[in-house]
UniProtKB/Swiss-Prot annotation:
Alphabetical keyword list: 4Fe-4S, Cytoplasm, Iron, Iron-sulfur, Metal-binding, Pyridine nucleotide biosynthesis, Transferase
Lineage, broadest ranks: Bacteria, Pseudomonadati, Nitrospirota, Thermodesulfovibrionia, Thermodesulfovibrionales
E.C. number: 2.5.1.72
Protein name: Quinolinate synthase
Similarity comment text for this entry: Belongs to the quinolinate synthase family. Type 2 subfamily.
Gene: nadA
Cytoplasm keyword on record: yes
Length: 303
């Protein structure tokens, strides 16, 4: 049945001139069928370089929105419309507008893990890989940083000269790692390097050997001479790490580090998306233009 589903997906993909993008946290079988696997911004940018009519984005809602922002002439499909992001959802747009009034001297730097509406209110966007670099490059001494308080704390450590006004959001999956989990994992695997995501709690980051985004973790594991790694991010990334580094061993800090929203998408929902042209993700043009400017400014600031 799985093989038949895969065959149907591949046939429809060819027929519709579509590409399938899968985030690093997706199910193994979804990663296997994807044309590209990566983090949200990498994937959206990849889509701009590929000659296609349809983008099937296997991820969560804000990621498909980002793809639509960067690819206005392409049809962007999100196979599971209920695949949301609790962290992105912490930002209430009306409350954010009140923050803009309260702190008129502080532009917004928004993590790409935000809605199109939030990006449209932002001076610049950032990723977990370039957040310190972006905040440092923004020509203002005070910054409103949304939505992740843990990433904001990580940025503060790298850019102490900036006043960072942080939104009180966090990723529930990364936030579940505690200091004790690191200590326990190190005790179980004393020869392994601990690599964690900057969305983790500050006390977890303090105990890590290396801090990186998912794409950064992939590069770090590939380049390191070390053979064992304890990975502090959603367990979906371990599939890619093991696949690309068969001679190395990867341990999850916690096997329960599963983002339920990232696991909703299945081969069946991808097939339905291509068959039924669902669910089309569109961003109103006035919002898209402003959000696009924030994403482009990020790229300009680090070029």
């Amino acid at each position: 049945m799985v093989n038949r589903t895969v065959e149907e997906i591949l046939a429809l993909k060819k027929q519709r001139n579509a590409i399938i993008l899968a985030h690093n946290y997706q199910r193994e079988e979804v990663q296997e069928i994807a044309d590209f696997v990566g983090d949200s911004l990498e994937l959206s940018r990849q889509a701009t370089k590929v000659d296609c009519d349809v983008i099937v984005f296997c991820g969560v809602h804000f990621m498909a929105e980002t793809a639509a922002i960067l690819n206005p002439d392409k049809t962007v499909l999100l196979p599971e419309i209920d695949a949301g992001c609790p962290m992105a959802d912490t930002v209430d747009v009306e409350e954010l507008k009140r923050w803009i009034d309260r702190y008129p001297y502080a532009p917004i730097v928004s993590y790409v893990n935000t809605t199109a509406e939030v990006k449209a209110l932002s001076y610049a966007c950032c990723t977990s890989a370039n957040a310190p670099q972006i905040v440092k490059a923004v020509p203002f001494s005070s910054i409103i940083f949304v939505p992740d308080k843990n990433l904001a704390d990580w940025v503060k450590k790298h850019v102490p000269e900036k006043d960072i006004i942080a939104w009180n959001g966090f990723c529930p999956t990364h936030h579940m790692i505690k200091k004790e989990d690191i200590i326990r994992a190190k005790k179980a695997h004393p020869d392994a390097l601990v690599v964690v995501h900057p969305e983790c709690r500050p006390e977890v980051i303090e105990l890590a050997d290396h801090v990186a985004s998912t794409s950064g973790m992939v590069r770090f594991a590939r380049a390191a001479s070390q053979k064992e790694f304890i990975i502090g991010t959603e367990v979906g990334l371990l599939y890619r790490l093991k696949k690309e580094n068969p001679d190395k061993v990867f341990y999850p800090i916690k096997k329960t580090m599963i983002c339920p929203n990232m696991k909703i998408t299945t081969l069946e929902s991808i097939l339905t998306a291509l068959k039924e042209n669902q669910y089309v993700i569109k961003v109103p043009e006035d919002i898209r233009i402003k959000a696009y400017e924030a994403v482009q400014r990020m790229l300009t600031l680090i070029s």
